[in-house]
Amino acid sequence: MRIHHWVLIAGLLVIGTGCNTKAPSPQAPALLMPATIKDIMDSMVEPSGDYVFESVQEISDEHGITEKAPKTNAEWEGVRRHLFVLVEAPNLLTMQGRKAARPEDRSRNPLVENEPEEVQKLLDADRPSLIRRARRLQDAAVLALKAVDAKDKDALFHAIDGIDKACENCHLHYWYPNDQRAREAAKEDGITDY
């Protein structure tokens, strides 16, 4: 009788274990990537960059020099929110498979701007360069974020200059490499790695 009990218990354990195994879950579908680099730049980076650039300024006019900087917690928080876009946008811009622009997109000024196909060739030819340039934007935005957290308008002003240089460096390489005026201005500002 005891042997029958042990056989019955062992059989139930085997059956129970077999029922407990899960079938392998199907692979999750790939995330959609409908946005192009141009879409991300137009809808996220440019508006956030404009907000940040306009947050700290020295305005010189007939009344003298006026400094503009965040003063209230809400103003600092507004700058902070837009900086997070600039910190995270490089991750989106450099995603493998992200296209430069839509097939129907065209350059507004083809004498100085690359067409989307030309930008795509540059991206495809040297992906590490894109990642390096995007990282410069990210690093500069992180510095600006630290300045905002410290509510240090002077450090923010300095960090914004770094953001501007990171943007211009990338644009001179991919978007408007034939713009001689922009190249000369970049050299005067110390931007030489484009």
Task: Cite the ranges covered by each PLM segment.
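Sequence context surrounding c-type heme c attachment/ligation sites in exported
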Residues: 20-80, 84-87, 91-194
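Bacterial N-terminal signal peptides that target proteins for export
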Residues: 1-8
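C-terminal motif of bacterial Sec signal peptides marking the signal peptidase cleavage site
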Residues: 15-18
